[in-house]
C-alpha cells in the first residue's frame, strides 16, 4: 500500500501556496478546463432500507434506520416537496399521515411514480441541501463548485455530465432552469454538456456455470461499469479534466476545503506536467548531457513514482527511448483521504507487465482476499480513494492522447448481480480510475476527510455536513 513516505504527497504550507499559485496562473491561460461528473447512476440503492420498510410486515418505523428517517424528516431538503406529494397521493400532509400511523404512505410518496419518484431517479436530480432561497440538487452543487475552481480566463465553466438515456431530458430541463441564475450568482458563464455510456461498451452476462445468461432466450448484455466512461472522457475537447462523483457534494458554507484542495491537486498536476514537457522538449532536441538524462530519470522515479530496476542496465540511447515513452503519457493527480474504514479502493504501488513499479488505485475485487498477506496489506492501507482526480490529457505538442490506448485490458473483473431474481456473473470493464487509467503517470496527494462527503443512503443527508 502507498503511504505518506511512499507515494503520497503531503505538501507543507509553502509548497501548498506555490501549487495554488500555479493553478491560478494556469487558469489564466487559454487552456480548456472541464469538470467531468459521472451522473448516470440511479438512486435506488440510496433508498434500499426504505423499500424494505414498504414491503415489511409491520407499519411503524422499527429499525434504527427507519426511526432516524422519520425523526429527521423535517431536515431533509425534499421535505416541502414531499409534503405536497403526500397531499396529492394520500390526501394528507406528512404530520397528518404520521399522526394516524400511516408511515408507509409517506415513504410511498417519496419513492413511487405517483409521488416524487425518488426511487427511480438518478442521484443528481434529488434535492440534497437546503438554502434560504430553495433547495439544491447535486447537479446544482457541481455547477457551484465548477465556478469556484474550474473557471477559465474568460469566466467560462465547462461541466460535462454522463447520464443515462432515460434521464437525459430531465437533466437538460434542470440545467435550463438553473444555469443562468447560477452564472449570475457566481459571475461565470456555464457551458454544460451531456453524454451517455456507449452501448458498444456493454458486456455479456454469464450464469453461475459460466454459460451465457439468457433472459427469455435472449442473451443479456449489461452496462460495463464506470470503466466504459473512458470513451466519454476521450471524446472531450479539454486540456485538464476534473473528475468527481455526483453524490460527493456539500453546501456552499462547507465548500472551502473542497475548493482549496481541488486547486491544490490541479496545481500539482500542471507543475509536474510543465516539467515533463520541458524534459520531453530537451530529449527531442538531442542536445542533452548524461547528467541531464540522470536528472530526468530521477524526476520520473522520485516525482512520478515510476521505477524500473532494469534502467540501471540501459545505455544512454536506450534510456532516452524509455524516458520519452514514460513521460509522454496522460497524467493524473488523485486526492487520497486518510482511511476511516470506508469501503472502496486504495492507493498502491503495483508491478506492471513491463516490469515497472508505479502508483495504481486498486479495488478489493482486484486483490486476492484469500491470501492472508494480501488481505492484510489491503486492510492496513493508511489511505483510500475518494474519487477526486485531475487529469492532463494532451501531449507536449498539444495533441490529444488517445486514452483508450492506456487501458490495461487485463484488469476487468467479475461482479455478482441478479436479473429477475436469478443470479448472474457480470463482466465489469477495468474501472475508470483503476485499470482504465493503468498506463498513466499517476501521483497521489493527501486531502482532508472534509472533502469526502458521499451520500450512500438517504439518512446520510441528515449528517451535519449536508445540513
Give the role of each language-model region:
Residues 156, 330, 343, 384-386, ...:
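A general secondary-structure signal for short beta-strands and their flanking turns/coil
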Residues 143-147, 371-375, 429:
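Short amphipathic beta-strand starts and helix->beta connectors
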